[in-house]
Amino acid sequence: MAVFVPGTAVGDRCVVRVVKVLKKYAFGRLEELLTPSPDRTTPDCSIAGPCGGCVYRHITYEAELKIKTQRVRDALERIGGFENIPMEPILGAPSRTRYRNKCQLPIGLSKNGEMQMGFYAVNSHRIIDTHTCLLQPEVFDRAAEAFRAWQKLSGESIYDEAAHSGVLRHLYMRCGEKSGEVLVCIVANGAKLHGEDLLVKMLREAVPEITGIVVNINRERTNVVLGRELRTLWGKPTIRDTLCRLEFEISPHAFYQVNRTQAEALYNKAAEYAGLTGAETLLDLYCGTGTIGLSMASRAKKLIGAEIIPSAVENARKNAAHNHVTNAEFLCGDAKDAARILYERGERPDIIVIDPPRKGCDAAVITTIAAMRPTRVVYVSCDPATLARDLKQFTAENYNIEAVTPVDMFPGTAHVETVVLLSHKKPDGHGEGLVINESNLEDTDKSRMKKA
């Protein structure tokens, strides 16, 4: 039986207390470290243990990359049942620190009634008061300290999750790595803050890089950070940044990769796998704001993107127009519906890129993709387990796994991305005369599909 023990490293000799036993594995707690592993290093963060963000700050980066590579391999072997996996070396990050361009800090009351702001402890909503985070740029630290000072002077109330009272809920910040622009967003349980002019003054003095200060109004009893309504206190409610030579406008609500440098590495690998020559139709399913597809649009004859969130589709359309991309269209709808509608209207994309959420693809999506018979499918995954499950169906639908590359988008954390190249076993022909299993697609609703 495997025993998972947080805070340990491969090669440690230690005393462990088993605290929870399940059917196939157990959880333990480190009681005493007898002999440290050669992979161990001194954590560079004072709250590395209790904070729920990083889990690998106590080991070397080389060891972290080995763990993440093995995690992908284990999932493909154990869940997918694959052997002789064509794994390529993991794409490690050039830096383990200061790589995040977004930060959201929950706000609460300490036992002595003062504001605390930071990150949630492991598996809880208990806030660990934090004045710096090594994953985020130093400019966020300065903005957070100015915000703390303003709260003390203004006396603005702190949100109480249990009572659903008080005003200040989160401090949410974004920055453009290339543009240098900074957006500060105060998430509030109400439309008005005490001392708004003072807040603007203190933030601008502490952080000259700030280009916008907004209030996000969230009056709901919810764990969702942002509400729908924004009010601008100063400047503009968006920032700009450049990714793969394209410029994107980013609002508090917009999806944008939090590690721009590694996002470019991932997109470049996806483009390499796509193998575009300029003659192909490219379908980008789960396209979000269009970043992956738009980064490849200049190498394709035609780009079609599909996304379920209307605001994201609108952002994708704006991003295409802003970057003078004229060979793209975007559909708003569920991936299953979008794939089926595109199939029925006769679209037979040569290359399909899919970047689904953590839950992976609906089985009907994979069935329709297989019916379209693209020569290549590029699968970008944020969860090795659902990736393995979906690849199992793809191989059953006449696709081969040609290459697998893990990508470390979030150094220090447990997360790992993966890019997979799938090729059709018989690339000639484009699905004419194929019959799709209607039982897998019976829920398709054309009325929910629309062009953006």
Placement of each model-derived feature along the sequence:
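Terminal RNA-binding accessory module
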Residues: 1-43, 47, 329, 336-337, ...
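Short, conserved phosphate/pyrophosphate- and ester-handling motifs at nucleotide-, phospho-/glycolipid
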Residues: 11, 136, 259
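Extended interfacial segments that mediate partner engagement and assembly in macromolecular machines
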Residues: 31-43, 49-158, 178, 193
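Flexible loop/N-cap segments at domain edges
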Residues: 171
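Structural signature of eukaryotic scaffold interfaces centered on beta-propeller domains
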Residues: 174-176
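C-terminal lobe
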Residues: 181-190
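Rossmann-like S-adenosyl-L-methionine
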Residues: 191-452
